[in-house]
Amino acid sequence: MADLKLGLQLGYWSSTPPAGFVALAQEAERLGFDSVWTAEAYGSDALTPLAWIGASTNRIRLGTGVCQLSARTPTATAMAAMTLDHLSGGRMILGLGVSGPQVVEGWYGAPFSQPLARTREYIGIIRQVLRREEPVASPGPHYPLPYTGEGAWGLGKPLKSIVHPLRADLPIFMGAEGPKNVALAAEIADGWLPLYYSPFRNDVYSASLSNAKPGFEISQGVVVNITDDIEKGLLPIKNMLALYVGGMGAKQRNFHKELVSRMGFEAEANRIQELYLSGRKQEAALAVPTKLADEISLVGPVARIRERLAAWRETPVTSLLVSARNATELRTLADVVLGA
């Protein structure tokens, strides 16, 4: 039975920066949390808050969960990761993900084509930058270096980073949902950031993870809700699932809906999307199976949560990433999970 590490999941900002997020990260470090994670969508970025947190902490690892590929070129992402790694004393975890077509094409103005090939090429270039063995070059087709296409002056040449990386093996994680993308993470990355994972359905991902190298990490976000009313405690998870399965993505291509279908809830996923897209959002949440919401979260009295943690310890998951609104909640979560 493996020990589980604990991470603090801060996510991305809503309309304004959340009050006290640095103090929360400091408290997480004091409590023995292993990592703190930020994210980005189409508002706040993932890297700047980590720099702010890193300046006020000493040990806790700093992860992006995730940086979107289309937000930056591979070399720009490598520069930011190297810089943060130096400033934090070697605590950076670079989490990367393709996002989805609505954000990539609607916010970044870039095509979403060939996400797997783009990811492989992107990470390959970052590895070149970090190794610093020779000037960085790539034949493309997604990120050709040097660029020689339309509009080029023909003066570009392969370059080697001026800065020497603190760690040539700076860990790179991938956010991935589809079987091929998860298999790619196992092949080329150092860790995986799933969206949903059920400790009772390890077979959903077992084939995709079969080629993971020793030391491969899996950091899974999980909602922890300590309550005596399990049904009521599951409502926020059901609302979240209704949003993602029903509305996060196009009707004809929703990666979250496809994942829930692979987990054994295809008919339910179809119904959730149908209700959500017709404006019946509350009904969509009520259509989320209690079994699904319960499996991917830790809800109930402390004794029940500790009992269900045993199932998580039998999985390949290495870290649970949790959220908290204040230091009191954080201390309770640390006691329940780390003290189990």
Question: Residue ranges of each PLM-predicted region?
Answer:
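Active-site-adjacent structural elements that line small-molecule/cofactor binding pockets in enzymes
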Residues: 1-340
